[in-house]
Amino acid sequence: MKAIKFFLGLFMFLLTLGLIAGAGGLYWASKEIRKPGSFDSSIDIIIAPGTGVGGIAEQLQYAGAIDSPMLFRLAGRYTGQDSKLKAGEYEIPPGASILDILNLFESGRTVQRTVTIREGLTNFEIHQLLAGMKDLRQVEPEMKPEGAYLPETYNYTREESNGDILSRMEIAMQSAMDELWSKRSPDLPFKSKEEALVLASIVEKETGLPDERARVAGVFINRLKQGIALQSDPTVIYALTLGEHENEGQGPLGRRLLKKDLEYDSPYNTYKNAGLPPGPIANPGRASLEAVLNPEKHDYLFFVADGSGGHVFARTLREHNINVAKWRSVRAQKSE
């Protein structure tokens, strides 16, 4: 009987010691996973899809973000986060604790990079821009019809490809066109989104001034309604670069447009062909789409550069010729 009491007492003593030790261990571990890290600058780390908590712990130790992979694994198991860590590129802030890192990886707040595609670029120019970005995976994207992409600032992660961004740009353009088309002015001289996109691309290339877009669009709308050729220089430039680069270049002409260029034989040349060209000449931004679908109402039929980055508008050819003469005088003075 005494032996039973002895062993029962010993068991209870050891159990108590174990509980105390366990509680002490939990208390220690709880403090350790909350203790600030010993690194004083941010650490960039990429977690590949399918990487387990053990592999992540080793990456973190190698990068200098943690000292003990085992403690990281135990912390992940203890908090239940070990199966919730998301792949991606992360920036770990200076002094982050193990718990901070687990919370970051569970949140999926990956590093967001941005690329700005400016308005008026051609598809080819956009493809070239994205192809030069070293932090994007590069694939061979399909060349979409001109004007398929909406110029904007796009977020991306290092795991994404140039094709992923192009796909988002294409979806964004379709979405913008659907939205703006439903709010269009009722008396436009065209009946399809495709035609609106063509004219928006011309407006985009004609002016970079926000307060001029609707007025320039109004000029082209008036000319279309009256059956007057658009006579837009950017359409000729597009025709020239399209031909000179064998349907691939579609960038800047690299020289001043000459009078003889206005006779260039191309369906895109709006000096030789009435109405709209067969397709867009660039990728217009949202503002140009809005301008074309809700143009300024006026009776202007002409415009020419004013020498200060904007344009001067005219109702008659006589008035326009006077403005052209003034522009040529300004240009001559600048070239002296």
PLM region spans:
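N-terminal start-of-chain detector that recognizes signal peptides
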Residues: 15-20, 63-64, 87-89, 272-277, ...
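Bacterial extracytoplasmic/cell-wall-associated proteins, especially those involved in peptidoglycan
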Residues: 52, 127-142, 147-336
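N-terminal short leaders/motifs
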Residues: 2-3, 44-48, 63-64, 247-248, ...
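N-terminal Sec-pathway targeting helices
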Residues: 1-17
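Signal peptide-directed extracytoplasmic domains
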Residues: 22-182
